[in-house]
Amino acid sequence: MMKRLVVLRRREPAVRFSCCGVRYGECRRNHAASTGGHAVDGCREFIAAEDGGGGNSTSAVGVAAAALKCAACGCHRSFHRRVQVYEVAWDDDCASGDTSSSSPSSSSSLSSE
């Protein structure tokens, strides 16, 4: 005789992560690589350099090159640690006003975590 197996599903609140933007942190350029050592300059955050306004820097290529150079340490943006900033969005069925269900699985879905 076969036994019955009952599987109960809980409705977990859906969580959506969306990438809001990218921030560049501290500089990781090794200035002592040629001597076999390790020395960083201490730049804590990437700050885009503004163009000086002289000569050929007003072209689109000059502005783009200036935006990739750090104003604080002079390094390229690729030497700075890339940090992605995420936004968390929760989808709650209970918050939408759907309280007509009296099943224990739907009422305990928020308190399980």
Curated annotation (Swiss-Prot):
Residues 93-113 are annotated as: Disordered. A zinc finger (ZF-HD dimerization-type) spans 24-83. This is Mini zinc finger protein 2. It is found in: Cytoplasm. Homo- and heterodimers. One of its GO terms (cellular component) is nucleus. GO terms for molecular function: DNA-binding transcription factor activity; transcription cis-regulatory region binding; zinc ion binding. The keyword Transcription regulation does not apply. InterPro entries: ZF_HD_homeobox_Cys/His_dimer (IPR006456). Residues 100-113 have a biased composition (Low complexity). Keywords: Cytoplasm, Metal-binding, Zinc, Zinc-finger. Its main location: cytoplasm.
